[in-house]
Swiss-Prot record:
Top-rank taxon: Bacteria
Protein name, entry field: Peptide chain release factor 1
Native organism: Helicobacter acinonychis (strain Sheeba)
PANTHER family in the cross-refs: LD18447P
Region (Disordered): 288-309
Bias type Basic and acidic residues, positions: 289-306
Length: 352
């Protein structure tokens, strides 16, 4: 038996074990264990179906090769073997993809955070432009976008936008967007026609629940204050704004979009959990990177991943040396698959 066949046999064995366990009274009465084993079985269901079919094809190939010795059946066996070899090749391609380790966060919703960096007002304007492109992409994928928090600047741009994006495969498609995005263009306010370079950071944080990350209440510093508007003027006469700081990591989240202090606190806590989970992911990726041939990117906010050059209509994805001369079309249509698909393909190739 080949190494691949042995691996697939072990997967099928585990699938059958899980089927038996999930029907046992002990597991049925243990909600935590039931959920855990159900998730495991679901994660290997697709590869199990393909494995069963592949092993069946191998058995049929073996039987037909034996029939080649039979004069009456040899021609029929030859024809059957041609079909079986094609099927075997197709299944091997499918199985190869299915054996790539699945990111446990791929099916999660995300918090998308865009923040203006260097470049002043122009950086803030690009935060808005890129956010619109993500919203158009979400429409194409039939995802739901909900702005959780936003902070505008004085020229129609944004200092920061945080949005919750819900839908199938959101994290799997957008996780490679994390990092620093650089834009080169002539600002509308530039009378001399000079090209300005500015940058914004993008963070992609999986939405998490209390089971996945727990926070000790004693590790939190919670402050309340009055919400401020443009120019620092007060827009609320009550202390409805909330700032929560996780003392061990010094990660802080402020929220003032809601009139209710309770709602602001709830939103801030959810984003704080997402940021702490994101930190865990980054640390794990750094540890795993030592075992990889190469990484698409760490997801670190400081990593410059992409340049948007408007005068040349050029989008450059630095991690995989991809250059596209259709920047304006991509931004207006939201068809980010032109960039995302090559990034995913590159990431998958690292497991081959």
């Amino acid at each position: 038996m080949s190494i691949l066949a042995e691996k697939l046999s072990s997967i099928l064995k585990r699938y059958d074990e899980l089927t038996a366990l999930l029907s046992s009274a002990e597991v049925i009465n243990d909600i935590k264990k039931l959920t855990e084993l159900s998730k495991e079985q679901s994660s290997i269901e697709e590869i199990s179906v393909a494995s069963k079919e592949y092993l069946s094809v191998l058995e049929n190939i073996k039987e037909n090769k034996e029939l080649l010795e039979d004069k009456e059946l040899s021609e029929l066996a030859k024809e059957e073997l041609k079909i079986l070899e094609i099927k075997k090749s197709e299944l091997e391609t499918t199985i190869k993809q299915l054996l790539i380790p699945k990111d446990p966060n791929d099916d999660k919703n995300i918090y998308l955070e865009l923040r203006a960096g260097t470049g002043g007002d122009e950086a803030g304007i690009f935060v808005g432009d890129l956010f619109k492109a993500y919203c158009r992409y979400a429409d194409l994928k039939k995802w739901k976008v909900e702005i959780v928090s936003s902070s505008e600047n004085s020229v129609g741009g944004y200092k920061e936008i945080i949005a919750l994006i819900k839908g199938k495969g959101v994290y799997s498609r957008l996780k490679f967007e994390a990092g620093t995005h650089r834009v080169q263009r002539v600002p509308e306010t530039e009378s001399q026609g000079r090209i300005h370079t500015s940058a914004i950071t993008v963070a992609i944080m999986p939405e998490v629940d209390d089971v996945e990350i727990s926070i000790n209440p004693s590790d939190l510093k919670i402050e309340v204050f009055r919400a401020g508007g443009h120019g620092g003027q007060c827009v609320n006469t009550t202390d409805s704004a909330v700032r929560i700081t996780h003392l061990p990591t010094n990660i802080s989240v402020s929220m003032q979009d809601e009139k209710s202090q309770h709602k602001n606190k709830d939103k801030a806590l959810k984003i704080l959990k997402a940021r702490l989970y994101e930190k865990q992911i980054e640390e794990q990726q750094l540890a795993n990177a030592k075992d990889r041939k190469e990484q698409v990117g760490s997801g670190d906010r400081s990593e410059r991943i992409r340049t948007y050059n408007y005068p040349q209509n050029r989008l450059s994805e630095h991690r995989i040396n991809l250059t596209l001369y259709s920047l304006e079309e991509i931004m207006l249509s939201g068809n980010l698959d032109e960039v995302i698909n090559p990034l995913i393909a590159h990431a998958q190739s690292q497991f081959e």
